C-alpha cells in the first residue's frame, strides 16, 4: 500500500518526459536544422564561369539504416543513415550546343546532347552518413552506446557590464556577442574615451568605427542622445593619433573612406590599407550572413534588450543595432538609465542540445566540402568533372565521426542502472568547445544563482574540479526553442491558484519581474491562499507580499531538484553536501539479482523507471495473449498481436547485467502506457536500486570505525546483494606474413583436460563454467624459423620431421576471474561480415559472474552515508530485536551528528513502521506545510500505530522513541543502552573489491626505465614514492631501502641473480646499478656534461693514480 503525503501536487500531467530534451532536440535537427544548414550551402561557380554546382538542401533524403540498433551493437557498427541531397551541375556554355542542334540536321549532335543532358541533370548525390538517435535518446557509435550531453554557454546578444580596470577605476562596456563570427565591444574607459573593440584585441575610436560602417553625422546625431559626449571623447584621441596623417582637423568632417582606412590599419597594421579591401573586410566581419550569424536567439535577445523590432530572420548586425546599443551604454554611464547584465543569470545562458551541436558539426563538414569542390574545379578538366567525382562525402563523414568519437560532449553512456542512464541524458555541462575550461573557471560561474531555481539542480554536481561546471536539469524543467531553460508555474489571480488552468512555463529573465509564491503554502479547498501575507521571490530576492500581489505559484516543493535528488526521502533534513553524495551514489548502485522497491520513497520511482527506457511500456490497449521469458504478445481491439522482445542477460557499458522480466500474465487487460516488463534495477515498474534491510546504529568491537559497515551473513546466503556482471573477451584471427592464424581444438603442448570444454571448432560451449586460465578459444599462429627453440631445431635436424610450426596464442580467462559462458558470437569474412583489414574471423565470448557481497565492497544509503564492509558476522552473533529478528547491518552512530544527514534516521524508523504495518510510504520532501516538525510527528505516529497493530510495545517506547533495547547475540544479554534500529534502503555500489584487489610478484617492466609498470590493468606494482623513502630513512632501514630501490625495481642484472638465488636456495647477491641511474647518466651526457667517478689508488712508487670507474658496469661498481 502506498501513502501519499501530498494531495494534488503530484499530478501526472505536470511531469514532462524526462528524456525528452535529447529526443526533441534531435527531432528538430532532422526537421529544421539539417535542411537549414544544407540549404545554406552556396552555389559554387568555377573561376572561368562555365561550371556551376547547386545543392537543393531542403529536399534532402535519408536512406533507411543498413543495420538495426541490435545488429549495429553486435557487429561494432554505427547505427546511421545515408544523406542524399539533390544537386545539379550546370554548364553555362551548353547553350551553344543547343543552338547547334536546332540549326543542324546531323543526328550525332542529337546523341551528344542526350549524353550532356544526362550528365548535367538534377539528381541525388551521397554526401555522408548521419548517426541516428535510438528511441531511448542514445547513439550507437562503433557498437557502443553514447550520449551527447547538453552544453550551457553564454547566449548571443548584447551585454552591459561595469568593472574595474588595472588602476581600480570604473570602466563601462557593451559587448555584442554573435553565435558565429566576430565579437564587437564598446568601452568607456576611466578617461571618458569611447572605444570600439573588434575580437577583444584591436581597438579604435567608437566615432571612427561608426563612420567606417557607412553612418553619416546626421544618422549618428539622430540616434545618439549623447552625441556631443561621443564627439568630445573622440577628439582627444583623434588629435593625438591621426592629426598628422589625416588632412582634416575637425573630427566631424572625417570621411567614410578615411575612417575605413584607419580601422583597417588598426586591424591589419602590417598590410597596406586600400579602400576596397577595407570595405570588404568590415563587411565580412559583421554584415556577411556567411561569416557572421547572431542566430535566432541573438536577434531575439538584442530586440528584447534594446526594444527593437528587427525581424528574427535578419541575423546579421544592422547599423541601427550598433547605434542603439552604443546609445544605451552612454545613457547607463551618464544618466544611470538602463540595467547591467549578470552573465551568470540563466536568462543570459542557454542550452545547446544534441541537435544544435550536430548542426554546427555538419556546417564545419560542409565548409570543408565547399573548399574541396572549389579546388577540384580549378585543378580538373571541366569536361571530366561530374557530380560523382566533384562531391566527396569524406569531409562531412570525418567531421561527424570526429564529433561523436572524440568531442568532450560525446560520452560513453553510463548504463550502471536506469537512474544513471536518465541522469546522463539530462546532464548539463559548461565545458567543451565554445565553453569554459575547468582550470580557469572561477568561483562565480560555479556558484549557485537565484535564477537556477526550478531550472538547474543546486544539489547534484560532481565533487572535485568539475564542481558547479556540470549540473543536472531540474525535474520539471524544459528547454524552449531558443535554448533557455523554463520552469512551470500556476497562475494566481486575486489570491486563487488556478490549478485547473494550463501550466505557464517561465524563463529566468521573465521571472525577475514576477512575484512567485513557493509551492508549500497552505491553500483552502477552493485553492485560495490562506495566509494574508506570504514570502515570494521577486527580482532574485525573497520579499513579503499580500496575496493580491502574487502573480504565480510554483507547482511542487521538489521543483528545484533533479531526478536523482528527488528520490531521496526526508531530503530537507540532510546537509547539502551529503545530499550531493547521496544523489551521485544512487547512480553507482549496481543492479541486484533480486531487486526490491523501497518501503520509504518519494513517489517518483515509477516515473523515473518509465522514462529511463529500461522497462517495457505497452504501446496499445489490449489483452495479454502470450508471455514467456523472452517475449510478450498483446492483442489489441482490432485483433492484431503486438510482440515485445525482452532483453536477456545483455552486457551494459559498465559490465553490469541488463535483464528484462515480464510482470503480466496471459489474459490480463493492459492499458496504453502500462509497464509490462521490469528491467535491471526495477521492481513492479518502480526503480529499485537496493534492498530494505534492518539497520542498527551502534558501535560493535571497533568494526565500524571510520564508517565501516558490519553485515550479517544472511545478506550473503540469501543473495540479497548478489549481482551479475558480464565481461566480454574478444579474439581476432589475423592473416600474418607466415600464413593465416587458425581457430582450432588442436593446440600444441596442451593437455586434453584443458581443451575439454571446447567444441570441435576450438570454441568454448555456451553454459560452460570457466575458471582463471581456462581456454575460451583455441588459436594457433604460424611461427618462423627464428621463433623455434633450439630443442625443436635439433629434433627436426635429427628426424627430419616437419612438425607443426605453430605457437599457442589461445584466448584464456584472465587471473582472478571465473564465471559461466552466456553467449558466443562468431563473425567471419567468408559469411559476408565486415571485418577490419587483415582479420579473417572475430570471436567474442561473454562470461557472466555472480558476485555475492563480501568484505571490501562499498555500500551506501540514499543520504550520503557510505562505507566499506569490514566484517561479515555469523547470524547467531548479530544483535537481535526483542522478537528475535537479527539485525542485518550495523552502522557507526558517530557518522550522523557531524555529517548532519539526519534524514537517514527518519527513513529507517519509518521503514521499520512500514515493515511491521505492511505499508509503503511516499514522502514528498519539504513537508513543513503540514505543520512544524511534520516529519517527526509522522514517524512517531506510524511507529505507534505499528506497535499497537502488532501488539509489540517495544516498537514505540515513549521514554526513548525510535530506540529499542537490543540483545547481544553472543551473550544473550541486553545491551546497556537503547539503540536506534530501523529498516533502511541500502545500496551496493559498483566499486566492488573484486575489481580493485591486486597483487604482483613478477610482471611487465617499462622499456626505458626498466621499472615495473603501474596500475591493475598492466599488472603493475605499487610505487615506492618519495615519502615512503623518507619513512624508511627515518627508521634506518638501509638494507630494506636498498633492496626496494634496486633488486625489486630496476636493477636488471640484480633481479635476475636474486631470482636464481631464491630458486636455488643460495644467499641473495649484492645489488648492482639501477637502470634509472643509467638513464640519468645518459641524459646528462646528452647535455654535454661529463659525469664520472674516479678511484684514487696508491702506486708502489708512492704516487697517486686516478682510475675512472664505468658506472654502467655492475662489476666495476661492486668492486669499488
UniProtKB/Swiss-Prot annotation:
<dbReference type="InterPro" id="IPR007645">
    <property type="entry name" value="RNA_pol_Rpb2_3"/>
</dbReference>
<dbReference type="GO" id="GO:0003899">
    <property type="term" value="F:DNA-directed RNA polymerase activity"/>
</dbReference>
<dbReference type="InterPro" id="IPR019462">
    <property type="entry name" value="DNA-dir_RNA_pol_bsu_external_1"/>
</dbReference>
<comment type="subunit">
    <text>In plastids the minimal PEP RNA polymerase catalytic core is composed of four subunits: alpha, beta, beta', and beta''. When a (nuclear-encoded) sigma factor is associated with the core the holoenzyme is formed, which can initiate transcription.</text>
</comment>
<comment type="similarity">
    <text>Belongs to the RNA polymerase beta chain family.</text>
</comment>
<keyword id="KW-0808">Transferase</keyword>
<dbReference type="InterPro" id="IPR010243">
    <property type="entry name" value="RNA_pol_bsu_bac"/>
</dbReference>
<dbReference type="Pfam" id="PF04561">
    <property type="entry name" value="RNA_pol_Rpb2_2"/>
</dbReference>
<dbReference type="InterPro" id="IPR037033">
    <property type="entry name" value="DNA-dir_RNAP_su2_hyb_sf"/>
</dbReference>
<comment type="function">
    <text>DNA-dependent RNA polymerase catalyzes the transcription of DNA into RNA using the four ribonucleoside triphosphates as substrates.</text>
</comment>
<keyword id="KW-0548">Nucleotidyltransferase</keyword>
<dbReference type="InterPro" id="IPR014724">
    <property type="entry name" value="RNA_pol_RPB2_OB-fold"/>
</dbReference>
<dbReference type="Pfam" id="PF04560">
    <property type="entry name" value="RNA_pol_Rpb2_7"/>
</dbReference>
<dbReference type="GO" id="GO:0000428">
    <property type="term" value="C:DNA-directed RNA polymerase complex"/>
</dbReference>
<dbReference type="Pfam" id="PF10385">
    <property type="entry name" value="RNA_pol_Rpb2_45"/>
</dbReference>
<dbReference type="GO" id="GO:0006351">
    <property type="term" value="P:DNA-templated transcription"/>
</dbReference>
<dbReference type="InterPro" id="IPR015712">
    <property type="entry name" value="DNA-dir_RNA_pol_su2"/>
</dbReference>
<dbReference type="GO" id="GO:0005739">
    <property type="term" value="C:mitochondrion"/>
</dbReference>
<dbReference type="InterPro" id="IPR037034">
    <property type="entry name" value="RNA_pol_Rpb2_2_sf"/>
</dbReference>
<dbReference type="InterPro" id="IPR007642">
    <property type="entry name" value="RNA_pol_Rpb2_2"/>
</dbReference>
<keyword id="KW-0240">DNA-directed RNA polymerase</keyword>
<dbReference type="Pfam" id="PF04565">
    <property type="entry name" value="RNA_pol_Rpb2_3"/>
</dbReference>
<dbReference type="InterPro" id="IPR007121">
    <property type="entry name" value="RNA_pol_bsu_CS"/>
</dbReference>
<dbReference type="InterPro" id="IPR007644">
    <property type="entry name" value="RNA_pol_bsu_protrusion"/>
</dbReference>
<keyword id="KW-0804">Transcription</keyword>
<dbReference type="InterPro" id="IPR042107">
    <property type="entry name" value="DNA-dir_RNA_pol_bsu_ext_1_sf"/>
</dbReference>
<dbReference type="InterPro" id="IPR007120">
    <property type="entry name" value="DNA-dir_RNAP_su2_dom"/>
</dbReference>
<dbReference type="GO" id="GO:0009507">
    <property type="term" value="C:chloroplast"/>
</dbReference>
<dbReference type="InterPro" id="IPR007641">
    <property type="entry name" value="RNA_pol_Rpb2_7"/>
</dbReference>
<keyword id="KW-0150">Chloroplast</keyword>
<dbReference type="GO" id="GO:0032549">
    <property type="term" value="F:ribonucleoside binding"/>
</dbReference>
<protein>
    <recommendedName>
        <fullName>DNA-directed RNA polymerase subunit beta</fullName>
        <ecNumber>2.7.7.6</ecNumber>
    </recommendedName>
</protein>
<dbReference type="GO" id="GO:0003677">
    <property type="term" value="F:DNA binding"/>
</dbReference>
<dbReference type="Pfam" id="PF00562">
    <property type="entry name" value="RNA_pol_Rpb2_6"/>
</dbReference>
<keyword id="KW-0934">Plastid</keyword>
<dbReference type="Pfam" id="PF04563">
    <property type="entry name" value="RNA_pol_Rpb2_1"/>
</dbReference>
Amino acid at each position: 500500500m502506498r501513502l501519499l503525503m501530498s494531495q494534488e501536487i503530484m499530478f501526472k500531467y505536470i511531469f514532462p518526459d524526462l528524456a525528452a530534451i535529447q529526443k526533441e532536440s534531435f527531432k528538430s535537427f532532422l526537421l529544421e536544422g539539417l535542411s537549414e544548414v544544407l540549404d545554406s550551402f552556396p552555389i559554387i561557380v568555377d573561376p572561368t564561369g562555365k561550371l556551376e554546382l547547386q545543392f537543393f538542401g531542403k529536399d534532402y533524403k535519408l536512406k533507411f539504416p543498413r543495420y538495426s540498433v541490435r545488429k549495429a551493437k553486435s557487429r561494432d557498427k554505427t547505427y546511421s543513415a545515408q544523406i542524399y541531397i539533390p544537386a545539379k551541375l550546370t554548364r553555362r556554355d551548353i547553350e551553344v550546343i543547343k543552338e547547334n542542334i536546332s540549326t543542324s540536321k546531323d543526328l550525332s549532335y542529337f546523341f551528344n546532347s542526350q549524353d550532356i543532358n544526362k550528365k548535367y541533370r538534377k539528381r541525388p548525390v551521397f554526401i555522408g552518413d548521419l548517426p541516428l538517435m535510438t528511441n531511448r535518446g542514445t547513439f550507437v557509435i562503433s557498437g557502443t552506446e553514447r550520449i551527447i550531453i547538453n552544453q550551457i554557454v553564454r547566449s548571443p546578444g548584447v551585454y552591459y557590464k561595469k568593472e574595474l580596470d588595472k588602476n581600480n577605476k570604473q570602466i563601462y562596456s557593451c559587448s555584442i556577442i554573435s553565435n558565429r563570427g566576430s565579437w564587437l565591444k564598446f568601452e568607456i574607459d576611466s578617461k571618458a574615451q569611447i572605444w570600439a573593440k573588434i575580437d577583444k584585441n584591436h581597438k579604435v575610436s567608437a566615432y571612427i568605427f561608426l563612420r567606417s560602417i557607412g553612418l553619416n553625422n546626421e544618422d549618428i546625431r539622430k540616434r545618439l542622445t549623447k552625441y556631443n559626449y561621443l564627439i568630445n571623447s573622440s577628439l582627444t584621441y583623434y588629435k593625438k593619433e591621426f592629426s598628422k596623417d589625416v588632412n582634416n582637423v575637425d573630427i566631424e568632417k572625417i570621411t567614410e573612406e578615411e575612417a575605413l582606412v584607419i580601422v583597417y590599419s588598426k586591424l591589419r597594421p602590417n598590410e597596406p590599407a586600400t579602400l576596397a579591401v577595407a570595405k570588404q573586410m568590415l563587411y565580412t566581419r559583421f554584415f556577411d550572413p556567411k561569416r557572421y550569424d547572431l542566430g535566432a536567439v541573438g536577434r531575439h535577445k538584442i530586440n528584447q534588450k534594446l526594444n527593437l523590432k528587427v525581424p528574427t530572420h535578419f541575423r546579421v548586425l544592422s547599423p541601427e543595432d550598433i547605434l542603439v546599443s552604443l546609445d544605451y551604454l552612454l545613457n547607463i554611464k551618464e544618466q544611470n538609465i538602463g540595467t547591467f547584465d549578470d552573465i551568470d543569470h540563466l536568462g543570459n545562458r542557454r542550452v545547446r542540445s544534441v541537435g544544435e551541436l550536430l548542426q554546427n558539426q555538419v556546417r564545419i563538414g560542409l565548409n570543408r566540402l565547399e573548399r574541396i569542390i572549389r579546388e577540384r574545379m580549378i585543378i580538373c578538366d571541366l569536361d571530366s568533372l561530374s557530380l560523382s567525382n566533384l562531391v566527396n562525402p569524406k569531409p562531412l563523414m570525418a567531421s561527424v565521426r570526429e564529433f561523436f568519437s572524440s568531442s568532450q560532449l560525446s560520452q560513453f553512456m553510463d548504463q550502471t542502472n536506469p537512474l544513471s542512464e536518465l541522469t546522463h541524458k539530462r546532464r548539463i555541462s559548461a565545458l567543451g568547445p565554445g565553453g569554459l575550461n575547468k582550470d580557469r573557471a572561477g568561483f562565480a560561474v560555479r556558484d549557485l544563482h537565484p535564477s537556477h531555481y526550478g531550472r538547474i539542480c543546486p544539489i547534484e554536481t560532481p565533487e572535485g574540479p568539475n564542481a558547479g561546471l556540470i549540473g543536472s536539469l531540474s525535474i520539471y524543467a524544459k528547454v524552449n526553442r531558443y535554448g533557455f531553460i523554463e520552469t512551470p508555474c500556476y497562475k494566481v489571480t486575486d489570491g486563487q491558484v488556478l490549478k485547473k488552468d494550463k501550466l505557464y512555463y517561465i524563463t529566468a529573465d521573465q521571472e525577475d519581474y514576477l512575484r512567485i509564491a513557493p509551492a508549500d503554502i497552505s491553500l483552502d479547498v477552493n485553492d485560495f491562499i490562506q495566509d494574508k501575507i506570504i514570502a515570494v521571490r521577486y527580482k532574485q530576492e525573497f520579499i513579503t507580499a499580500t496575496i493580491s500581489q502574487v502573480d504565480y505559484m510554483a507547482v511542487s516543493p521538489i521543483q528545484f531538484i533533479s531526478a536523482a535528488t528527488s528520490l531521496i526521502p526526508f531530503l530537507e533534513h540532510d546537509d547539502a553536501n551529503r545530499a550531493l553524495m547521496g544523489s551521485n551514489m544512487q547512480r553507482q548502485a549496481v543492479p541486484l539479482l533480486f531487486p526490491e522497491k523501497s518501503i520509504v520513497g518519494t513517489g517518483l520511482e515509477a516515473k523515473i523507471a518509465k522514462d529511463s527506457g529500461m522497462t517495457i511500456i505497452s504501446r496499445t490497449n489490449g489483452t495479454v495473449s502470450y508471455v514467456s521469458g523472452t517475449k510478450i504478445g498483446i492483442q489489441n481491439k482490432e485483433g492484431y498481436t503486438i510482440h515485445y522482445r525482452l532483453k536477456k542477460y545483455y552486457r551494459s557499458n559498465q559490465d553490469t547485467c541488463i535483464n528484462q522480466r515480464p510482470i503480466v500474465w496471459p489474459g490480463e487487460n493492459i492499458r496504453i502506457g502500462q509497464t509490462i516488463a521490469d528491467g535491471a534495477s526495477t521492481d513492479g515498474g518502480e526503480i529499485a536500486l537496493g534492498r530494505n534491510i534492518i539497520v542498527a546504529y551502534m558501535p560493535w568491537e571497533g568494526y565500524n570505525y571510520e564508517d565501516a559497515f558490519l553485515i550479517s551473513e544472511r545478506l550473503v546466503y540469501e543473495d540479497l546483494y548478489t549481482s551479475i556482471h558480464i565481461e566480454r573477451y574478444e579474439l581476432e584471427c589475423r592473416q600474418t606474413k607466415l600464413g593465416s592464424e587458425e581457430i582450432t581444438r588442436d593446440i600444441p603442448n596442451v593437455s586434453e583436460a584443458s581443451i575439454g570444454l571446447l567444441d570441435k571448432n576450438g570454441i568454448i560451449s555456451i553454459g560452460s563454467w570457466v575458471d582463471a586460465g581456462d581456454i575460451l578459444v583455441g588459436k594457433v599462429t604460424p611461427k618462423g624459423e627464428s621463433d623455434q627453440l633450439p630443442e625443436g631445431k635439433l629434433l627436426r635436424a635429427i628426424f627430419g620431421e616437419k612438425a607443426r610450426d605453430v605457437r599457442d596464442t589461445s584466448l584464456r580467462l584472465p587471473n582472478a576471474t571465473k564465471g559461466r559462458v552466456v553467449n558466443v558470437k562468431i563473425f567471419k569474412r567468408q559469411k559476408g561480415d565486415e571485418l577490419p583489414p587483415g582479420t579473417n574471423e572475430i570471436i567474442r565470448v561473454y562470461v557472466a559472474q555472480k558476485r555475492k557481497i563480501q568484505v571490501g565492497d562499498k555500500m551506501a544509503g540514499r543520504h550520503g552515508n557510505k562505507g566499506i564492509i569490514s566484517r561479515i558476522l555469523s547470524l547467531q552473533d548479530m544483535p537481535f530485536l526483542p522478537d528475535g529478528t537479527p539485525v542485518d547491518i550495523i552502522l557507526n552512530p558517530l557518522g550522523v551528528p557531524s555529517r548532519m544527514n539526519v534524514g537517514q534516521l527518519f527513513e529507517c524508523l519509518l521503514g521499520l513502521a512500514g515493515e511491521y504495518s505492511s505499508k509503503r510510504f511516499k514522502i514528498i520532501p519539504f513537508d513543513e506545510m503540514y505543520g512544524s516538525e511534520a516529519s517527526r510527528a509522522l514517524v512517531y505516529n506510524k511507529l505507534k500505530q505499528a506497535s499497537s497493530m502488532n501488539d509489540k510495545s517495544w516498537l514505540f517506547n515513549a521514554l526513548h522513541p525510535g530506540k529499542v533495547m537490543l540483545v547481544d547475540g553472543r551473550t544473550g544479554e541486553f545491551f546497556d543502552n537503547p539503540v536506534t534500529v530501523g529498516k533502511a534502503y541500502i545500496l551496493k555500489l559498483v566499486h566492488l573489491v573484486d575489481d580493485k584487489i591486486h597483487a604482483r610478484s613478477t610482471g611487465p617492466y617499462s622499456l626505458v626505465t626498466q621499472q615495473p609498470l603501474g596500475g591493475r590493468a598492466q599488472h603493475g606494482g605499487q610505487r615506492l614514492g618519495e615519502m615512503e623513502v623518507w619513512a624508511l630513512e627515518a627508521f634506518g632501514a638501509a638494507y630494506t631501502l636498498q633492496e626496494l630501490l634496486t633488486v625489486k625495481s630496476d636493477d636488471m642484472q640484480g633481479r635476475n641473480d636474486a631470482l636464481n638465488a631464491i630458486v636455488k636456495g643460495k644467499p641473495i647477491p649484492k645489488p648492482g646499478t639501477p637502470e634509472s641511474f643509467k638513464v640519468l647518466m645518459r641524459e646528462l651526457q646528452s647535455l654535454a656534461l661529463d659525469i664520472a667517478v674516479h678511484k684514487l689508488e696508491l702506486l708502489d712508487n708512492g704516487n697517486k693514480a686516478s682510475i675512472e670507474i664505468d658506472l654502467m658496469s655492475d662489476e666495476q661498481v661492486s668492486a669499488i
